[in-house]
Amino acid sequence: MFKKFEYKILYKRIFFTCLILVIYIIGSNISIVSNENLRTHKDSFFKLAITNVGGDLHTLNIFSLGLGPWLSSMIILTLINHKSNDKVKTQTRRERHFKERALTLIISAAQGFYIIHSYINKHAIKDSNMLILLLVLITGTLLMVWLADQNTTYGISGPMPIVLMSLVKSIFNTHFPKLNSSASLITMIIVLLVLALFILFFIELTEYRIEYNDIMNISAKDIPSYLSWKLNPAGSISIMVSLSLFMLTNNIVNFIGRFIVNHNFETHVFNFTNPVGITIYLLLQMILGYFLSRLLINTKRKSKEFLKNGNYFEGIQPGQQTEKFLGSKARRICWFGSIVVAIVLAIPMYSALLVPHLLKEVYFTTQMIVFVYIGINIAETIRAYLYFDSYKQILNKYW
């Protein structure tokens, strides 16, 4: 007898996510200044960075800043609260949200000021309506954060579908109509892209398993119990967060420089057009990827769970010895995953320096890597909903 499972919860979540994406598409097409003035303004680095966090600088619209300020505020607060977990646990959801939104407001104001000031310096827009434009950008950012927050609760994968849609829009608007390279060059780019995606698939779908003794599962001795970790637990969120922080650093340096040095000051250190900037970004990506992975694995909490449940590793004492054992394993796994992801991103970025006329194609490759990586994470989320929804008929008997 065939059983038909109705994935009603999943369908509702997909519908809600589609509704959020429709709102994002409409908002990203509402320009707040003339498009003709912005077509002459080209900043490939900034457009690439802001696209990967859900923003759009091809036109100055209400969602131009994207989710970068929000992602930056979350990682900053996470690093601040890392040593005081007890205080964080006592905070209410309203208190946490207030801190996130307040810091997001400050960061979005700084980034918005930098973007508008850059357009003014290059005579793309006039400075007479600067405060109004800044207010619109900040309001759009907070609205976008609210949409991502609602999608986390009622939709699928939180902010990731918004970033995915931003990448799709950027790829079609910027790259496809303008790829004029030779057939052999395009073939080489495709081969490198496939190789990079294969490595990312390997990292995402491969698990590192540590076998342990489960005292509650004595009847099934032939079936081993194991603790499984992904090779890169942080996933695509580390790329988005690292780009957001790198872009924030660039904005802060330029913001301070234009007040202290001169109003035309613009640093080229925190940029993808020089090896120093790329190296700084890759180091930031590795470090953030490592710490986010360690935060998600949380070996301290896992060792406490083992101590409470009575589970243990062969030859390892429960408690502190288990925590050290898991910490050493997690350290190797997290560094390996973050370094491999950084290497995959480094290849197209450094290639752009060696072959400058391929900058457009290289940025296209980078965006495709991020696009597929986010797509993998969304697919895993949908698979998880499919898995739990298949047990809905059984669970309904007890709930």
Swiss-Prot record:
Gene3D superfamilies tied to this protein: SecY subunit domain (1.10.3370.10)
InterPro entries linked to this entry: SecY/SEC61-alpha (IPR002208), SecY2 (IPR014269), SecY_dom_sf (IPR023201)
Predominant localisation class: membrane
One Gene Ontology cellular component annotation held by this UniProt entry: plasma membrane
Keywords: Cell membrane, Membrane, Protein transport, Translocation, Transmembrane, Transmembrane helix, Transport
Pfam family, one: SecY
GO biological process, one term: intracellular protein transmembrane transport
Membrane topology category: Multi-pass membrane protein
Residue spans crossing the bilayer: 14-34, 60-80, 102-122, 128-148, 152-172, 183-203, 237-257, 272-292, 335-355, 362-382
SUPFAM superfamilies: Preprotein translocase SecY subunit
Localization terms from the record: Cell membrane
Disulfide bonds: none
UniProt keyword annotation of Oxidoreductase present: no
NCBIfam families assigned to the protein according to its UniProt record, in alphabetical order: acc_sec_Y2, PRK12417.1
Family membership: Belongs to the SecY/SEC61-alpha family. SecY2 subfamily.
Biological role stated in the UniProt entry: Part of the accessory SecA2/SecY2 system specifically required for export of possible cell wall proteins. The central subunit of a protein translocation channel.
Subunit structure: Component of the accessory SecA2/SecY2 protein translocase complex required to export cell wall proteins. May form heterotrimers with SecE and SecG subunits.
Designated name of the protein: Accessory Sec system protein translocase subunit SecY2
Organism of provenance: Staphylococcus epidermidis (strain ATCC 12228 / FDA PCI 1200)
Primary gene name: secY2
